[in-house]
Amino acid sequence: MAYRLLRALFRGLFRVTIDGVTDQFKHEKLIITPNHVSFLDGALLALFLPIKPVFAVYTSITDTWYMRWLKPYVDFVALDPTNPMAIKHLVRMVEQGRPVVIFPEGRITVTGSLMKIYDGAAFVAAKSGAAVVPIRLDGPEFTHFGRLQGVLKTRWFPKISIHVLPATTIPMPQAPRSRERRVLAGEHLHTIMMAARMATVPRETLFEALLSAQTRYGRFKPCIEDVSFKEDSYQTLLKKTLGVSRILQRFTVPGEHVGMLLPNATITAAAIFGASLRGRIPALLNYTSGAKGLQSAIIAASLKTIVTSRQFLEKGKLTHLPEQVNEVNWVYLEDLKDTVTLTDKLWILFHLCFPRRAMLPQQADGSALILFTSGSEGNPKGVVHSHASLLANVEQIRTIADFTPRDRFMSSLPLFHAFGLTVGLFTPLMTGSRVFLYPSPLHYRVVPELVYDRNCTVLFGTSTFLGNYARFAHPYDFARVRYVVAGAEKLAESTKQIWQDKFGIRILEGYGVTECAPVVAINVPMAAKVNTVGRILPGMEARLINVPGIAQGGRLQLRGPNIMRGYLRVENPGVLEQPSAENAQGELDANWYDTGDIVTLDEQGFCAIRGRVKRFAKLAGEMVSLESVEQLAISLSPEGQHAAAAKTDSAKGEALVLFTTDSEITRERLIKVARENGVPELAVPRDIRVVKALPLLGSGKPDFVTLGKMAQDPEMSV
């Protein structure tokens, strides 16, 4: 009777629903593993699960007054994590057919993300052979019974959902010692819990996700700031978004690809969301690619209109672009301010109250945004991402990293790059963090000063940028920073060392590609390993394809919710080329993406990048990584610029060429370093060419197409 009354009360107050695979509770041996977000979790499961389970509760909690009060109504067993006999007792209960609920995190989350996973539950599952049913609780964290006050906008009676995921098992890991088996089983359970979170992500468009964040964290919560030093709340950002969307629809049509040539600024964020909510697809253009690069993007994406700013073009010394690229209609934001009418203002005011009514009908799987590859190995390609793929990558990042509304991001990486867009804009907005948008990562003195001045806690950058920030920064500039993540290029040992020595900060290395929105793997405090780029993100499948001549590692191919919709190529304008990859049998598999990177994956799932397939040279039948050649030069001259290329050779098929800005580098010195590092002499180039500077792309990466031509033609210069 008491159960029925409480169930009716909870259902009335919290509108509790239970969904998913609800017939998963008939297994003979069963362990239920929910996430832990509030003090209500146990009561919710006891009231709404179709079975009467035993709750494994840590001894520190069983002695509290409310647990003593609940004892007559709920079965629970005290679990002492320091006592091995407690685990054996649980195993016996499971083997006797009692369904057991264990909260693997062991404590209520204080970040909104998964906390540390204790391996006890996993070891019980592996030892007993029980089915593991993950459960995802959504909603209790918003109540006053959670521990996220000040992180989320708490309320008295939020809607609560109980999602039941498909049952799985944890096989006993193969390891010589019991301790190692426990750890491996715990990692398996952590993977299951992360997958459960990814499986219950709502399918939304970018604009819907922004509105959800506003609801979650509060409409007046400050969220975004730029060099104007005027911080906007979610409400103010929404107002700007609606204003831009209203004006954009005058000279564009639904479904049109709209070019955007804009800096890192709040108005750019408003333009992206504004175009998206009215069914337009923003194409973020690389303003460092020059007229030729813009023309390639215009052809590939079939652009008719480019939105930009006169002030930006003047400050960036880009005023020549509209004159040289005259095949599109250039629209200037400054010219649009005076065109806002009273009708427009009333439309904006109405939709501030009812923002979802401003949206045109869209699907989460539909095209949301176009980015462009760097063009380091040919013409830039348009990469079309859906709303779902972009938001999936944000959720993957949120699943493994504990970003909260207490964090402040410094975002100086250009928004036209996937790294800057997803990590520097979408992730902070969707996690309730505040973000400072700065227009250039090249201001090595200014960026550290702003990190200090704005109390930033999260900084992302390339190895080159981070190294230069460290050289110019005061030792106290990064005192509040807790996450520094390097990506887009290999993290130099010198950069890693200076951050450790000068600031006491460990740089976490990650790996991504534009086609994956972009983050593929990342080291985080909970799971980090030196000389790797971290584990592949939850929700993604990875496979390695053998490459003839390369003994260590394989060609990385990926499938997952964050994979692009497809390419737009200059050779086939406006036609979407869907992703596919050749499997080990030589057959094309749809929805797989071939990264072209040679990687290794260890037994714990950590990924190490060995090089790109296209950046290997075949010398007398042996495959040599051009990146390994560059690392030899970097060891000799950390401050210099170095890049390796291959040229045709009548004797060996191909020969190595090293381009360097350091005239002190010789073959003899390279051979000495190679021997010290166990690198074969075959990887030491005979052709060493000193240049004033390497040819670079707008992104700062070496232009390997030009370097390849220079390698073939000794007379050619930058």
UniProtKB/Swiss-Prot annotation:
Pfam families: Acyltransferase, AMP-binding, AMP-binding_C
Membrane topology: Multi-pass membrane protein
Region (AMP-binding): 233-646
Entry keyword set: Acyltransferase, ATP-binding, Cell inner membrane, Cell membrane, Ligase, Membrane, Multifunctional enzyme, Nucleotide-binding, Transferase, Transmembrane, Transmembrane helix
Taxonomy of the source species: Bacteria, Pseudomonadati, Pseudomonadota, Gammaproteobacteria, Enterobacterales
UniProt protein name: Bifunctional protein Aas
Disulfide bonds: none
EC numbers: 2.3.1.40, 6.2.1.20
HAMAP family: Aas (MF_01162)
Stretch forming the signal peptide: none
Gene symbol of the encoding locus: aas
Predominant localisation class: membrane
Subcellular location: Cell inner membrane
Listed SUPFAM superfamilies: Acetyl-CoA synthetase-like, Glycerol-3-phosphate (1)-acyltransferase
One of the record's GO molecular function terms: long-chain fatty acid [acyl-carrier-protein] ligase activity
Annotated stretches, region: Acyltransferase: 15-138
InterPro entries: Aas, AMP-bd_C, AMP-bd_C_sf, AMP-binding_CS, AMP-dep_synth/lig_dom, ANL_N_sf, Plipid/glycerol_acylTrfase
Record-annotated membrane-spanning stretches: 258-277, 409-433
